[in-house]
């Protein structure tokens, strides 16, 4: 199979898998909006940064370790490559412990820190407690999926992710309504879904063509650090949504209160779907780019970067056409109380915010390419610019100048600035070895 066909095979399957992951958060939002109205949507939006942080750690360890594994295997360093999988699982479980402890002892305190008032905190404690207790499974799901994909089984990784997501959607409804568990039921369905995904992915480890081995060893900070170097773009890619959500939540609370945060909850949930599409392009291309890099195939790696960038631009155009043409319909799905104010806020937000994906798609693909070709410093600069520095500065400045419309427009502005920086970094290295 030629490189272009391999690219579209890996990317399409990874997009479908990650879309499934983001869609179960959409399902949560829809069912919670039906059960608890705008307060429920506000609660979920306050919890999204916590989800993002958990997913970001799993993504950083999983993608980074799997990238190291793919590069070393392409270079013939089989023994060194095998140490990364077991170390990633051990370290993820250790890093999950603080989240589990917070879930047991002080979920309410965490919700207050995220900006929840007394009513939101009381509503959200059961929800937060349950999903925090299952943090190890969320993190390990990223790791197992990344290694299965890098070991030549992207189809199985896609099936596993979609199966977990379908389970979540179906059991969201069953747990919340027929069984009457309310928000705790939504959290339980979300928490169990990665366990199913891990179980399906684990079939690969018993196949004849499996090359991933679980090595008995003590957790290694050195291996973890080497993994995180190449996984930092994945971390910041996930965290960018969390940072954006946290900053926007506090700005919108100050501008218009809980209704504005609920409106942003609608925007943020659709943004998760959009981000998943572009993460799918970057993560789908990563095994192929890493293999080209390990084999010193500079032309192949650059071809994949061009394919990824063009694919991201085409997807951004299709995405914005859907958002622009169906804005009121999309907002209406999550406005069970028919709040005219929330609908107005969310309508403006969707149309301004999603312009940013014309630039964000390129930034995500480029950061993934830099990580996959063992350029962690440049990947980190690009990712931190888009995920933290640019979005914080733009949102603070533009909200002060233009109010709520400034908050929505901060995302496209920050992604444009990051795209210019990323293009400079790529062109600066054009004459150097991949």
Language-model features: locations:
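Transmembrane helix-bundle signature of multi-pass secondary active exporters and lipid flippases
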Residues: 14-63, 67, 131-138, 225-291, ...
């Amino acid at each position: 199979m030629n490189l272009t066909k391999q690219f579209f095979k890996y990317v399409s399957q990874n997009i479908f898998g990650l879309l499934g992951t983001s869609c179960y958060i959409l399902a949560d939002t829809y069912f919670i909006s039906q059960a608890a109205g705008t307060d429920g949507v506000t609660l979920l939006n306050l919890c999204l940064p916590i989800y993002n942080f958990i997913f970001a750690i799993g993504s950083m360890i999983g993608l980074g370790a799997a990238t190291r594994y793919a590069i070393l295997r392409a270079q013939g360093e089989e023994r060194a490559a095998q140490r990364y999988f077991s170390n990633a699982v051990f370290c993820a479980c250790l890093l999950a412990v603080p989240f589990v402890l917070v879930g047991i002892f002080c979920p309410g305190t965490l919700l207050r820190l995220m900006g929840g008032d007394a009513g939101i905190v009381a509503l959200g404690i059961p929800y937060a407690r349950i999903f925090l207790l299952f943090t190890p499974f969320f993190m390990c799901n990223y790791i197992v999926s990344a290694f299965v994909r890098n070991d030549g089984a992207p189809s199985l990784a896609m099936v596993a992710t979609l199966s977990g997501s379908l389970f979540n959607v179906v059991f969201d409804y069953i747990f919340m309504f027929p069984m009457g568990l309310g928000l705790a039921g939504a959290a339980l369905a979300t928490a169990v879904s990665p366990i199913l995904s891990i179980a399906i992915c684990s079939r690969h480890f018993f196949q004849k063509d499996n090359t991933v081995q679980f090595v008995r060893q003590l957790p290694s900070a050195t291996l973890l650090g080497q993994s995180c170097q190449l996984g930092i773009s994945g971390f910041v890619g996930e965290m960018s949504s969390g940072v954006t959500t946290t900053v926007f939540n506090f700005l919108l609370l100050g501008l218009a209160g809980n209704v504005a945060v609920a409106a942003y909850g609608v925007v943020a949930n659709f943004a998760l779907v959009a981000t998943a599409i572009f993460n799918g392009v970057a993560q789908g291309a990563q095994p192929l780019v890493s293999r080209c890099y390990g084999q010193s195939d500079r032309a192949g790696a650059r071809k994949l970067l061009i394919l990824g960038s063009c694919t991201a631009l085409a997807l951004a155009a299709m995405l914005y056409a859907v958002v622009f043409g169906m804005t009121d319909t999309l907002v209406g799905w999550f406005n069970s109380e028919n709040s005219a104010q929330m609908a107005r806020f969310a309508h403006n937000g969707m149309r301004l915010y999603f312009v940013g994906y014309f630039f964000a798609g390129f930034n995500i693909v480029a950061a993934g390419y830099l990580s996959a070709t063992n350029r962690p410093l440049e990947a980190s600069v690009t990712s931190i610019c888009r995920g933290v520095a640019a979005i914080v500065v733009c949102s603070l400045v533009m909200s002060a100048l233009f109010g709520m419309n400034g908050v929505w427009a901060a995302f496209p502005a920050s992604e444009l600035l990051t795209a210019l920086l990323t293009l400079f970094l790529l062109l600066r290295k054009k004459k150097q070895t991949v």
